[in-house]
């Protein structure tokens, strides 16, 4: 066997070239697997093995990376990781250097996130040359968020502290759950239809990847991109990143940071105003000097012309302008006076005193009608009672007695209308028109 003289590798050289090949060709990869042999030494680094049913690979996640992981990994847990293939040269072991780690459930969402991110980037929605500049002097901010969440309280607190002069218009929307993305799109479209603010602040507090998923909507990305108003995305905490952050004109890490970005400190604003006033005074001074020079030149030219004639023309023009100004002022004052009278009439009509007078008259009218109706009802009732009394009197037994008849009852006060009801010796009572008569039956005659 012939040994080559110039192509003999050392172990270190071989491991180094293998490392360069793996890192250069594979780059970053996503890997799904089960954690085993997890260890977290005092250095702060994590070491673990990812495995499936057939294979396994050693992994390392250094302290600077694992501090952003929101959970503590445990053996047997399914995770989705992103990292770079490398070779640990001292042992010749190839391994995965993990950059980010998510639970397997969040991992599926992360894959969808990356796929949508690549798609929208290819469409140019993240291009830097499409980003709009924020207005320099923001007077009114439109906040798109939940009106009851912590984010709006943070935003209002920061604005009140830094620049109370900024007005805030809240476009209430759902910021979590089903159809939240379409709800946010509708709020952005409403703001663009009204065009009543200088800039939009899309914001909510922190949460899990699933909680913030509505901000990773393709429809929302296109709505933000097509917005005529500049959009600042301030969603979640500093470690959270959403599609809305990439497509918005500016990204702020938190709601409070978004409010600070869109406001100026009161002291800085006063200093800036003083600078503007100073520049304005300088401009006015320069303008005055310029006009004085121009006036001097005109005076010199005027001396070469007929001063009296020129003056007469100026006086005539001045008179015309004065008349036009007086007419305009008169018309304006007349219009204002008429408008004032109209407003006074409308105010009088809307005055509580006027309404009270109308209601008082109406109440008096209703009271009169009620009293008349009660009197009519009382009169009708009296007439019916009188008629009924007359009818009762007509059929009353007492009325029969007044015509000369009598009523006879036995000892039990039973009315006797047949002689067969009595026997000789019975006691009977006869009621006349005036008084009663008690009798004893001595004879009974049957006249039937």
From Swiss-Prot:
Pfam (any one): Exonuc_VII_L
Subcellular location field: Cytoplasm
Main localization (coarse): cytoplasm
Catalyses which reaction(s): Exonucleolytic cleavage in either 5'- to 3'- or 3'- to 5'-direction to yield nucleoside 5'-phosphates
GO molecular function: exodeoxyribonuclease VII activity; nucleic acid binding
Top EC class, one word: hydrolase
Key words of the record: Cytoplasm, Exonuclease, Hydrolase, Nuclease
Entry keyword annotation includes Hydrolase: yes
Subunit-structure text: Heterooligomer composed of large and small subunits.
PANTHER family in UniProt: EXODEOXYRIBONUCLEASE 7 LARGE SUBUNIT
Protein name as it appears in the record: Exodeoxyribonuclease 7 large subunit
Originating organism: Shewanella sp. (strain ANA-3)
